[in-house]
Amino acid sequence: MRAYLTRRRPLLRWLTALALFFTVYLTVRTSRAAMNWLCGGVIFPVMRRISRLCDFFDGSVGEVLLLTGIWAAVIWVACTVRRLATGPRRGAVLADFMLTAGCIALTVYAGFCLLWGTAYNTDGFQEKSGITAQPVSAEALERVTLYFAEELSAAAGEVPRNADGVCAADRKAILAAAGDAYDGIYEEFSFLRMETGRVKPFGCSRALSVLRFTGFYFPFTGEANVNMDSPVAYLPATVCHEMAHQRGIVSEQECSFLGILAATRCTDPVYRYAGWLEGYVRLSNSLYSIDPERCLAIRDTLPEEVRCDLRADSAYWTQFQGAVSQASESVYDAFLKGNGDANGVRSYGMVTDLLVTYFNT
C-alpha cells in the first residue's frame, strides 16, 4: 500500500489542493461583498473576454469540449474494463481508475464553483435595478395577462409563417440579430450594457430537447448556447434569457424576466413577438392555476396565428415526455437548490411575479 501511495503522490497532492479550495470556497462564498468583488471585478470580465475569443468558431466551443470529454470518458472506461477483465493487478487498476476519476470530477466541479457557483451569492438584477418581485393579486395578474395577450395579438401578423400558420422565422437571422437585442433596455438598466461573445447554436439540439432544455450558459467558455430544434417562435426570448446569464445574472427568474423584457423592446418584430408570446405563456399558466375560467376567456381573444404556435409548441415538447426528461428536471432542480435557489426549477415560473410588478404600473 505504501509503495502504491508513493507512486500516486501527485494525485494525492492534487486532491489535497482541491480539499483546500473547497474549504476556502465554502467559507468565503457566504460573503456577499467578497463575491461581488470576485465576480464583478475578476471572473465575469475575464469570461466575457474568453467568450469573445470563442467567436472565432461559428459553433459552440463549449459543445466541442463537452463532446470531447464525453467521448474521452467512454474510451477511458472501456479501456479500464478491458484491463480489469484481462490484465494483472486488477485491484491497482481499479484503485487508479477511482482515484483519477475522482480527481477529474472534483477538478471540473471546482472550476464550475469558481466560475459560476460564486455568482449565486452576488447582487442580482433585483438588487441592482431596485425592481423587486412582490406578491401579486389575481386582479393584477389578470390585467397584465390581458395586456400581454393584446400585444401578442398585435405582433402575430408581423412574423413569417408556413402553410400551417406556424411561425417560420429564420433561425440564423435570429442569432445574427442578437447583438442588438438588449439595446431597448440599456437606457433603463445601464448596468447590463457590456460586450459579450455571440450566442451560439448548439449542434446536438435534439439531445437538449430530450433533456427539456431550450438553452444554457456554459461557464467554462462564457458562451450562451441555444436549442436550434425547438419551436422557433420562442427562440428570440431564449436568446435574450441566455444573454442575461452572460451579463452576470444567475437567477433563472430574473433571466426569464430580462429575456422577455428585452425581446419585447427589440426593434426586430420576430423578437418582439417571441417576447410577448413567452410572457403570455408564463402569465397565463399562473392565471390558470387560480382562475381557469378567466384565463380561457383571455385565450379566446388570441388570433389563430398565435394558437397555431401554442399548439405547435405543445406538440413538440409532448414527444419528449418520459423518464429521461423527468430525471433531467429532478437533477436540475437539485442543482439549483444546491446553489441557493430554494425554488429550484419553479423559479422559471415565478417570473410572473416580476412581470406583474413591472408591467402593472
Name the predicted role of every residue range:
Residues P160-M228, V232:
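Auxiliary, metal-adjacent structural segments of Zn-dependent hydrolase domains
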Residues T6-L12, G87-G102:
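Membrane-interfacial entry segments at the cytosolic side of transmembrane helices
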Residues G117-I185:
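Membrane-interface segments at or immediately adjacent to transmembrane helices
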